[in-house]
Amino acid sequence: MALRHKSAQKRHRQSLKRRMLNRSRKSTIKTFTKQAVAAATTGENLAAAQSKAESLIDKAAKGSTLHKNAAARKKSRLAKAINRVKAAQQS
């Protein structure tokens, strides 16, 4: 990349740092979401796992890693998945 100006170079460095932070946060969200769904199947620590996943999603939305609507959608889908697993276990 031909970044000739100091400010452009700095913004590029900042964008790379921000990208890595965002990728890390999104990866963590995916990991804890999967753990919450897995906890629903085993039945242990479900409330804590779901709470942790939703907390991470909210923090990502607050810090502009995720859009607020995307965060709401992820939380909704997480709750649906957990409820689906619970219903399957009861029947």
Curated annotation (Swiss-Prot):
This is Small ribosomal subunit protein bS20. GO terms for cellular component: small ribosomal subunit. Binds directly to 16S ribosomal RNA. Disulfide bonds: none annotated. GO terms for molecular function: small ribosomal subunit rRNA binding; structural constituent of ribosome. The gene is rpsT. Residues 1-26, 67-91 are annotated as: Disordered. It comes from the Bacteria. Belongs to the bacterial ribosomal protein bS20 family. Pfam families: Ribosomal_S20p. Keywords: Ribonucleoprotein, Ribosomal protein, RNA-binding, rRNA-binding. GO terms for biological process: translation. The keyword Ribonucleoprotein applies. The keyword Lipid biosynthesis does not apply.
